[in-house]
Amino acid sequence: MSTNTDLSLSSYDEGQGSKFIRKARETPFVPIGMAGFAAIVAYGLYKLKSRGNTKMSIHLIHMRVAAQGFVVGAMTLGMGYSMYQEFWAKRKP
């Protein structure tokens, strides 16, 4: 019974940084989506001063749609990449 607890507790020994790096290697498009989201939000907030005649609510909606579009695109590419690796790349013996 102690071996079961040892196996389940081994995931808690892993630090946050090493866990993030391991997950990033398993699914590389998730950190790309997160970085793109952060970059689009930062750029949108930077451009908030010089938005011109545009209402703030419209500017924020455009920023949200762009960030969501980037994340959905990264998720779609990641799904396609995973499907490629699982079904087509491993077929060659």
UniProtKB/Swiss-Prot annotation:
The chain crosses the membrane at residues 28-48, 69-89. The modification Phosphoserine is found at residue 8. It is a multi-pass membrane protein. It holds the Pfam family HIG_1_N. The keyword Phosphoprotein applies. Residues 90-93 are mitochondrial matrix. Residues 2-93 form the HIG1 domain. It is found in: Mitochondrion membrane; Mitochondrion inner membrane. It comes from the Eukaryota. Keywords: Acetylation, Electron transport, Membrane, Mitochondrion, Mitochondrion inner membrane, Phosphoprotein, Respiratory chain, Transmembrane, Transmembrane helix, Transport. InterPro entries: Hypoxia_induced_domain, RCF1. GO terms for biological process: cellular response to glucose starvation; cellular response to hypoxia; mitochondrial respirasome assembly; negative regulation of apoptotic process; negative regulation of release of cytochrome c from mitochondria. The keyword Membrane applies. Expressed in brain and spinal cord. The modification N-acetylserine is found at residue 2. Associates with cytochrome c oxidase (COX, complex IV); proposed complex component. Also associates with respiratory chain supercomplexes. Proposed subunit of cytochrome c oxidase (COX, complex IV), which is the terminal component of the mitochondrial respiratory chain that catalyzes the reduction of oxygen to water. May play a role in the assembly of respiratory supercomplexes. This is HIG1 domain family member 1A, mitochondrial. The gene is Higd1a.
